Amino acid sequence: LFNTPVVPTRAEATNAEGKLELGKIYKHHNPGEKPMPGPLPGMTVSIDDSHVLEKHIAAGVYRGDMRCEAGMVALYHNAGTQMLEYEACKGGVAIPYSLHTNPINIGYPDSLGIGAAVIGDGNTDMVYEMAQTDRKMMKAEGLNIMYGPQVDVTSDPRWPRTSGTYGERPDVTSDIAEALVKGYQDGDNGLNEGSVVLTIKHFPGDAPSENGFEPHVPIGQWRIYRTPGSMEKYHLPPFQRAFDHKVSSIMPDYSRIATDGRAVPQTYRGEITSTEEVPSAYSKELITDLARNKMGFDGYVNSDSGITTVQIYGVENLTEPERYAKAISAGTDVIGGNTDPENIVKAVEDGLLPKADLDRASYNRLLSLFRTKRVDNPYLDPDKADQARVDNFDGAKKKAYEANQKAVVLVKNHEKLLPLAKSQKVCIVTFKGVDSGFAQMAQAMGAGLGNTDEDAALRKTLTEAFEKKGYTVVATPEEADVLYLHVWPISNGLVFNQYAMPVIEMGEIVTDERERNKSQKKTGNKVTVVTLKDVEKIKELADAIHARG
């Protein structure tokens, strides 16, 4: 789940003799090193070459965003492929290495901003162009599979993953989904040599989580539909549009339906969609009957990470081999995040998993490798990867800027303060605190951020941006003509902690501590959380600057 080059640049990976060192590209296994735990139980962020050479894992999830040179990512991909080729020469299976990635921001607005921009002019050309630009860079550096886009239609403002959606309108999200499939897969006739494999998520729509909680943890395991037909009307349309344009893969959600009266039963074309209280990756009704047979999905199904060990809602009493068997027989082709194929072997040997179901899963997943011609020529040129980033990323800056302008609405311009006069002195004050969930992920991604306050780095970035535009930045409000407040709420590592809802709270909140990543039971302790650091200072600062006119 956490695959990133040891160092971000080729210069750092090159020794005094001018040769690249493999150990600075792909981490070498150190038997004495204690594995670093990941953000969820049973997962590690200590990924090294033993995962390929000993466990024969043929894929990983890249977490370096744009921090690593494109050429370094290509070299990491090549190293993984070469290790697999070495194993194949000893009698293993010749499968090229696959690097997955979550969506990486290349300067365009994030998802909600994309949704806002599309609503603004009703045009998705910008979305298609963004996807085409990103596709070319991804292919050049070996990022062949995207865990995205997230086409959940948000229906509860408390849900912490709303920021990753395109908003609350099914029609807008559907239009965006179509443009993304065409752009990333290089057409709408399925995969080809130029395609990035898209894994749209989280089927059949994860937004109606009970009370807005997130299903990575048990407190958020239930999907509650409040009205008849809401799944078909609001949550399924973006998936249907993606299926119509031959999206290559889907990722089911962790959550499960509630059948105890809390939710209204959901139908699709007049038939009940599902009755079994299990996560979607375990539901044959949803994966095979609904997605494949009724909605026409024709790709492979990739589960989210940890469904056999962590998010085991409703299958707690099954053994791990039984869980694998149930998920695969339900129609899931790839079990994400796990590195224990022995459980699949045992499921077959014990008669739990029909060999035909395993063959179907293997065929569906391998088909994407052949359709994108990765088996024929798996190695990449790092120089071409670097050049592809220069050509596409730099070339997209103007369009990305225009997209950001479309995504932003000026709510207020008191006394025509904007645009600022270049003669005005600006003081920058930031309000962003410590996000423990982000810090955990940053540590896993090798960013070296740790659990730190990001205000200093944020102020530095903003100062440079203002000065580049010709403004004078001063240190204190007393010196300033204009006070720039950069307000950035955080969610207290919400996905993994569930301490608070992701809304701006006016001050600190004292709440019950819960077991992180486990049962979410209350520990008996209290914790203090705040989504907006030092919020009480905003009025004080505003009064001070207004007093100066």
Question: For each predicted feature, which ranges?
Answer:
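Glycoside hydrolase catalytic-domain context in secreted enzymes
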Residues: 1-549
